[in-house]
Amino acid sequence: MFGKLKEKLLETASKITEKIYSKGEAEEVKEEKEEKSKISFTSLFKKEPKKEEVKKEKAEEEIKKSEIVKTEPSEKVEEAKEEIKEIKEEKEEKKITFFDRFGLTRAIKKVLKKEVVILEEDIEDVLEELEIALLEADVALEVVEKLIENIKNELVGRKISPDDNVEEITINAVKNAIKNILSQEKIDIEEIIKKNKAEGKPTVIVFVGINGTGKTTTIAKLAYKLKQKGYSVVLAAGDTFRAGAIEQLEQHAKNVGVKVIKHKPGADSAAVIYDAIQHAKARGIDVVLADTAGRQATNVNLMEEIKKVVRVTKPDLVIFVGDALTGNDAVYQAEEFNRAVNIDGIILTKVDADAKGGAALSIGYAIGKPILYLGVGQRYQDLIEFDADWMVRKLFGEEEFEFSTEREF
């Protein structure tokens, strides 16, 4: 996930660090750090049998027993001999130094010989390289420009003294620049559901996007997540245009354990969703998740239809579902849907297969709306809440995420 983007960001931080070291005429120094000692001072002079010595004695005992009874070496004896050999090899490898025994470690680090003030010209070439790399990673141009500006704001004019940790300063500067891009105002879907429930009405969420992004599957994933949290859910088969769309949603609903409200293929999408809302009101169901036909923004008739859906059903949220693998195309699509129906948030799918990370970095900033969830696999549980801090940690290799290869659909 985001491998190329991660590599370039870390490389940028490293190059800026080296620029600062060069300007500050940094020199390498050895330092000794005291860590929590694993042994007490008195134990240094106390003769106690070591674990490997005890193991060695036991192994030698096995060999002696075999010789006394004058039998052929058993498997156990052969294992004992092998164990003695391994212990000797380990002892050769583990040469404990004076520093090790006192819990001290020695490291080489660079220290500035003089104070440095970072100028724009000092880091300009590094940022130009980053700009090209980000564009190649499908990051939107306006986002690239903003990110470069953010890094400059973090670093240019900053004074760095010999006592400062240069690596920490540069990595934090890039992190903060990224976080600024990712931090859009959050939407708490659960809070909306709870508020509406207290008022005795369902929460209505309409999903929009083009074909092939995983919109219908995402609806099923969110239904599963909400059901796991104790909310009742009904699905509205508002995609009456695509062949097999209703059947696909029905199968997902069966797997997840929720009901679907549907009409015949070709029916009015707004009417289907309206009926689902009335059904939810009559039965006290908490949430209506409404599918709609995938459509290109250039298809005027279908875009007019989605405007009608939003106008008639008055949803609490309109969520755009985009494919992370399409990079800048996902950003363009989100912008078009936002112009048409004023979307409230974004769900990005197929993020587990996204090596570039351009869409994830760009889409929220480009339209000024938050990413709500990320689709990260092919199980109903593979929908995770988006968090800017988590994304930054992921981009800088500070947190790994285990993806499942299992498939449920």
From Swiss-Prot:
GTP binds at residues 209-216, 291-295, 349-352. Pfam families: SRP54, SRP54_N. Keywords: Cell membrane, Cytoplasm, GTP-binding, Hydrolase, Membrane, Nucleotide-binding, Receptor. It is found in: Cell membrane; Cytoplasm. Its main location: membrane. GO terms for cellular component: cytoplasm; membrane; plasma membrane. The keyword Electron transport does not apply. It catalyses: GTP + H2O = GDP + phosphate + H(+). One of its GO terms (molecular function) is ATP hydrolysis activity. The keyword ATP-binding does not apply. Its EC number is 3.6.5.4. GO terms for biological process: protein targeting; SRP-dependent cotranslational protein targeting to membrane. It comes from the Archaea. Part of the signal recognition particle protein translocation system, which is composed of SRP and FtsY. Involved in targeting and insertion of nascent membrane proteins into the cytoplasmic membrane. Acts as a receptor for the complex formed by the signal recognition particle (SRP) and the ribosome-nascent chain (RNC). Belongs to the GTP-binding SRP family. FtsY subfamily. This is Signal recognition particle receptor FtsY. It comes from Methanocaldococcus jannaschii (strain ATCC 43067 / DSM 2661 / JAL-1 / JCM 10045 / NBRC 100440) (Methanococcus jannaschii). The lineage of its organism: Archaea, Methanobacteriati, Methanobacteriota, Methanomada group, Methanococci.
